[in-house]
Design a protein with these regions (language model features):
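Short amphipathic alpha-helical signal-transduction/dimerization elements
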Residues: 67-74, 168-173, 228
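Histidine-centered active-site/metal-ligand motif
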Residues: 35, 179, 183
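Conserved kinase catalytic-core helix
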Residues: 109-116, 151-180, 193
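Intrinsically disordered or highly flexible coil/loop and linker segments, enriched in small
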Residues: 75-79, 98-99, 115-119, 173-177, ...
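Conserved ATP-binding subdomain of kinase catalytic cores across diverse folds
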Residues: 1-145
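Helix-rich C-lobe and terminal helical cap/extension of kinase-like folds
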Residues: 130, 139-143, 147-163, 190-295
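Hydrophobic residue at the +6 position relative to the catalytic HRD Asp in the kinase catalytic loop
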Residues: 185-189
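The start of beta-strands in P-loop NTPase/AAA+ ATPase cores
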Residues: 44, 132, 176-178, 200
Length: 295
């Protein structure tokens, strides 16, 4: 806590006196620490994401050191693809410590979902934000993997699952940017009462949201469409034009298409996919992940 307090004082100055901050973190990670806080003037509950001192400045040197280690040990072939991947990781690391970008992304998603009662996005509180501190409203909820979630009726769990998948599909087909770190820690569920108050998904962390170029988005959309229609040739065609797939021998592509069709089985329409295993669809023609072979 002393190091975190010193960082807060350096970043927020006198504004820090406005807040009562819990010394125990809500969560810790390699780049930052999250603390709960309360604004004294009105009792507003907040969350402060506090970047560790020196993290942003160390990214390039640490990444270069890691890259040299890989070269010396020859653990990874030194190819153009590796260079592209490494530069991509470096760029993503810099984005994750750029709290201005994360604040803007959070606002963008909040605006998109503000009229949808199934989702909650924290509100950014600019007054207590800086280059290395991100402040937002505290949003209550239970973890995705909480035993409470397992005790929910199946229909409520289905609705939460559908809402989660809908976000992913809209990211690809509508918004053109995706959450590239969809781990359970980035989500909570605010439970309703099963009647007039519905369950809501709380979206917490937008630091790993990545925008994709139109070409890659077109490839991804066509792959998903091919899965929906469960069409092997359509799947092969969807692969064409993307460097990774174009480098694969033509003789292998049909087999790879079969793998992709299996991976997108849950998105295929029953009328298009006669290969669906028996019992994998429920009485309402919905895909039952628990009975599938995909998990």
């Amino acid at each position: 806590w002393p190091a975190i307090k010193q960082q807060l004082q350096a970043q927020l100055g006198a504004k820090l006196d406005d807040l009562t901050i819990d010394h125990e973190p809500l969560g810790t990670a390699s780049l930052a620490q999250v603390h709960r806080a309360t604004r004294k003037s009105d009792g507003l509950e907040l969350v402060l994401k506090i970047q560790y001192p020196g993290v942003a400045d160390a990214i390039d040197s640490d990444m270069s050191l890691f890259r040299n280690m890989l070269k010396l040990t020859r653990m990874v072939p030194q190819t153009r693809e590796f260079d592209q991947w490494f530069d991509e990781v470096r760029e993503m690391m810099h984005r994750e410590v750029n709290y201005q970008i994360e604040a803007e992304t959070t606002r963008r998603f909040a605006a998109r979902l503000k009229d949808d009662p199934r989702y909650i996005v924290p509100q950014i509180v600019d007054e207590y934000c800086s280059d290395q501190v991100l402040c937002m409203t505290f949003e209550r909820g239970v973890p995705i993997n909480s035993p409470v979630m397992l005790s929910l009726p199946q229909e409520r769990r289905n609705q939460l699952g559908e809402a989660s998948l809908e976000i992913a599909v809209r990211e690809v087909f509508e918004w053109g940017e995706m959450q590239t770190d969809p781990n359970f820690g980035n989500y909570l569920v605010r439970l309703g009462n099963g009647e007039d108050i519905h369950d809501k998904i709380v979206l917490l962390d937008f630091g790993a949201i990545r925008q994709f170029d139109q070409h890659l988005l077109t490839v991804a959309r066509n792959l998903i469409k091919a899965g929906y229609y469960h069409d092997p040739q359509m799947m092969v065609n969807a692969m064409t034009g993307y460097e990774f797939f174009d480098s694969i021998p033509e003789s292998i592509k049909p087999d790879m298409a079969k793998v992709f069709l299996l991976a997108t089985e849950a998105f295929s329409h029953l009328d298009n996919n006669r290969d669906l295993p028996a019992g994998v669809m429920d009485e309402q023609s919905r895909y039952d992940w628990k009975k599938s072979q995909l998990h």
